[in-house]
Amino acid sequence: MDGWSDLSSAPPQYREVAGIADWALLAQGLGWSINYLAMIYHSYKDRTYGMAILPLCCNFAWEFVYSVIYPSHNSAERAVLTTWMILNLFVMYTAIKFAPNEWQHAPLVRQCLPWIFPVAIAAFTAGHLALAATVGVSKAANWGAFLCFELLTSGAVCQLMSRGSSRGASYTIWLSRFLGSYIGGIFLHVRETHWPQEFGWISHPFVTWHGLMCFSLDIAYVTFLWRIRRQEHRSQRKKAL
């Protein structure tokens, strides 16, 4: 993301291809918007929530910080982040509404749900602000997004495995998240190769590790979802007999 960098200092070779990065960003925005809408739909359909609670709170906090407190100077980026934050409000609403259905087996968690959401959002908001104060807004926006995605992908796998059910999950949710996330590699590549003074850190080993970990978790997610769906279909056929 370049909306918090000093674009006036961008080299000519980056300005020539900045449009490619912006189009990739808009495509990423569309993918994640579809993901949010699909989660909202399946939350009402299955009376559950689609995104694990703590990753959801971290993700919403990040969108709030970089939409409201530190808005991007890039109009495309600002539009994408604002859209995500608005859609995520509805994702958050469905999580608050239906979370008690998933915690019947854990009375303490169920009783604390009204506190877990606001406390977690406040804590993650403070964390994102602290990161921005430590490394600068531009780097914090990117590193914070990496943290959100690591929590989200690992949380999605854990949630699917612990439920043992496809409630709140679908191939649409997975595919829109997968494509919406990894198309981001296009604008990361454009920025790293054409503006290395500002985005040379993209080639660091940690970023490579992050990408491989999240990719592996996304593949694990769709594999588990396929197995669970197959088991559910078999059970339905047996009941029909």
From Swiss-Prot:
It comes from the Eukaryota. It catalyses: 2-oxo-3-[(8S)-epoxy-(2E,6E)-farnesyl]-6-(pyridin-3-yl)-2H-pyran-4-olate + H(+) = deacetylpyripyropene E. It is found in: Membrane. Signal peptide: none annotated. InterPro entries: PaxB-like (IPR039020). Its main location: membrane. GO terms for cellular component: membrane. Pathway: Secondary metabolite biosynthesis; terpenoid biosynthesis. It is a multi-pass membrane protein. The chain crosses the membrane at residues 20-40, 49-69, 79-99, 113-133, 141-161, 168-188, 206-226. GO terms for molecular function: lyase activity. Terpene cyclase; part of the gene cluster that mediates the biosynthesis of pyripyropene A, a specific human acyl-coenzyme A:cholesterol acyltransferase 2 inhibitor. The first step of the pathway is the synthesis of nicotinyl-CoA from nicotinic acid by the nicotinic acid-CoA ligase pyr1. Nicotinyl-CoA is then a substrate of polyketide synthase pyr2 to produce 4-hydroxy-6-(3-pyridinyl)-2H-pyran-2-one (HPPO) which is further prenylated by the polyprenyl transferase pyr6 to yield farnesyl-HPPO. PANTHER family: PTHR42038, TERPENE CYCLASE AUSL. Belongs to the paxB family. This is Terpene cyclase pyr4. The lineage of its organism: Eukaryota, Fungi, Dikarya, Ascomycota, Pezizomycotina. The gene is pyr4.
